[in-house]
Structure formats: structure tokens, C-alpha cells
């Protein structure tokens, strides 16, 4: 098992749950009022508390509209108002989110396999699934050495900023297409920034079966990922993440473990 001392320069990163580089989903063909309510909820991905004026300004709507939507959402428990009059996400939204999390079949299959990889490597292990142009980490087992990089934030990342996103896009045309449409804005010094580099990375993954990214999302952090493929298409990824000095020298040992884990998850998930 990899051993390491805590690096004070690698701490839990304060990062928004929402990818500002990713276009928000449209509401073409849907109800405008529902779209507005969802836009209001998404405002809270950037800030824990917001006032009526804050929401109105961000969405470009009248304060009266923002107030009506917030009042309706509060009545259903999706937001709640504190003593100062500001709003925050409500417990009912948390309940629904936990139900979605608990009912994720891939997560149920992957969790014991992830734990085995964590025990063998000592690194943080992530399960990523695609969502549009992004990858969302639906499960995480933290490193035993106390080095925390993501903590409870950073659950959603643009696909081009993570090894998980790259390996999924290499075997999932939909993710590849969505990321190309969204572009490749830089996030850290190792972020893929050009379509030519994206093409090269996907070709490399298809040849080698895994991806490694250094300082893709966070400076001096590295990750290695392998796709979880069902009927040839990537439905997720399993990866390890940690400070670059720990991950880089351990890649030769880690990649076969991740490959075996991904194959086991895919076999059980598709059974």
C-alpha cells in the first residue's frame, strides 16, 4: 500500500458544484415556468445562500418573478428561508438527491470493487458517470493517508479536465460530441485546451485503455482512469486521484488494478 505524509499544499478544494464552462441545458419544448424554477435552483450551486435580488439579477428577471418562484419552491421544501430572509437549498431537495444516489445501480455494483482498489493502493478512488459534457463523481472513497483534494465539492467536472472524462468520451460518442460543442476552457495548467489535443488524448486512450492527467483540474494533482464499458460503450469510469508525487510513480501498479476492477464492474452491472 502506498504510504505518504500529508502535503499541506494539497487541501480540499473549494470548487463550485456547477461547471461554469458547461452550457446550461435549454428548455426547448418545455414549460417556461418550470425552466425558470430549475434555473433558480441551479443558482444555489454557486452560492449557499441567496436573496431575492441576487436571484433576480442572475437570471435577468423581475424581483417579483424571483420572489414568486422562491416562495413556491419554499412551499414544497425545495428551498428554505433563514432568519435573515435569504434562501438556501431545502431538505426535500436533499431527500430526492439521496434517493437518486441510492438507486444508482452502477454505484451499488461498483462500491465493493472500489473499496478493494482503495485498500490495495491507498489512493482516493472515484466512480464517474457521464452527464452531457461533464463527468459526475457519484461515489468516492477517500485516501487513507489523509490527503484530501476534492472533499464534498468538485463532484462535477468538465470531461476535458479529468482522466475520467477523457476515458468515457473515448468510448462514448455522445460525451465526445457534447464536450466538443462546449469547448475546452482551461481550468489548471494541465487542462486539455485544443481540439487537436482532445483528439490525440482520445486516440491514446483507445490504444492504451486508460488515461492519465496531471494538473487537469487541480494543480499538482494527478488522476488515472479506466472506462467501465457495457456492450462497448463507456457508462462510467473508475479512477484514482492524488498528489502527483504519489500517483505518477505508482501508475504501473495502479493501471492493471483499475482495469481488472472496471471489467468486474461492467460484468456484474450488465448481468
Task: Give the label of every model feature segment.
Residues 195-203, 208-211, 218-220, 235-271:
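Juxtadomain coupling helices with adjacent low-complexity linkers
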Residues 2-7, 11, 18, 146-217:
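Short, solvent-exposed recognition segments
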Residues 85-183:
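Amphipathic alpha-helical effector-binding/dimerization core
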Residues 2-103, 107, 233, 263-271:
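N-terminal helix-turn-helix
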Residues 222-226:
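Short hydrophobic beta-strand micro-motif common in sensory/regulatory domains
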Residues 30-34, 90, 103, 107, ...:
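Short, structured helix-loop boundary elements
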Amino acid at each position: 500500500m502506498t504510504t505518504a505524509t500529508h502535503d499541506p499544499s494539497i487541501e480540499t478544494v473549494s470548487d463550485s458544484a456547477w461547471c461554469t464552462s458547461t452550457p446550461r441545458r435549454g428548455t426547448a419544448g418545455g414549460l417556461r415556468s418550470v425552466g425558470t424554477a430549475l434555473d433558480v435552483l441551479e443558482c444555489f450551486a454557486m452560492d449557499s445562500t441567496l436573496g431575492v435580488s441576487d436571484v433576480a439579477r442572475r437570471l435577468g428577471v423581475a424581483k417579483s418573478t424571483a420572489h414568486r418562484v422562491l416562495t413556491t419552491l419554499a412551499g414544497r421544501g425545495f428551498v428554505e428561508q433563514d432568519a435573515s430572509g435569504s434562501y438556501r437549498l431545502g431538505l426535500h431537495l436533499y431527500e430526492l438527491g439521496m434517493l437518486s444516489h441510492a438507486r444508482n445501480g452502477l454505484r451499488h455494483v461498483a462500491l465493493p470493487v472500489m473499496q478493494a482498489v482503495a485498500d490495495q493502493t491507498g489512493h482516493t478512488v472515484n466512480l464517474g458517470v457521464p452527464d452531457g459534457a461533464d463527468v459526475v463523481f457519484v461515489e468516492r472513497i477517500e485516501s487513507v493517508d489523509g490527503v484530501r483534494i476534492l472533499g464534498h465539492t468538485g463532484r462535477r467536472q468538465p470531461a476535458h479536465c479529468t482522466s475520467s472524462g477523457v476515458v468515457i468520451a473515448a468510448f462514448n460518442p455522445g460525451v465526445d460530441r457534447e464536450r466538443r460543442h462546449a469547448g475546452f476552457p482551461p481550468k489548471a495548467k494541465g487542462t486539455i485546451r485544443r481540439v487537436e489535443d482532445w483528439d490525440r488524448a482520445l486516440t491514446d486512450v483507445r490504444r492504451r485503455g486508460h488515461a492519465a492527467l496531471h494538473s487537469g483540474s487541480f494543480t499538482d494533482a494527478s488522476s488515472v482512469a479506466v472506462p467501465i464499458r457495457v456492450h462497448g460503450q463507456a457508462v462510467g469510469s473508475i479512477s484514482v486521484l492524488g498528489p502527483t508525487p504519489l500517483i505518477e510513480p505508482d501508475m504501473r501498479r495502479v493501471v492493471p488494478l483499475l482495469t481488472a476492477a472496471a471489467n468486474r464492474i461492467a460484468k456484474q452491472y450488465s448481468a
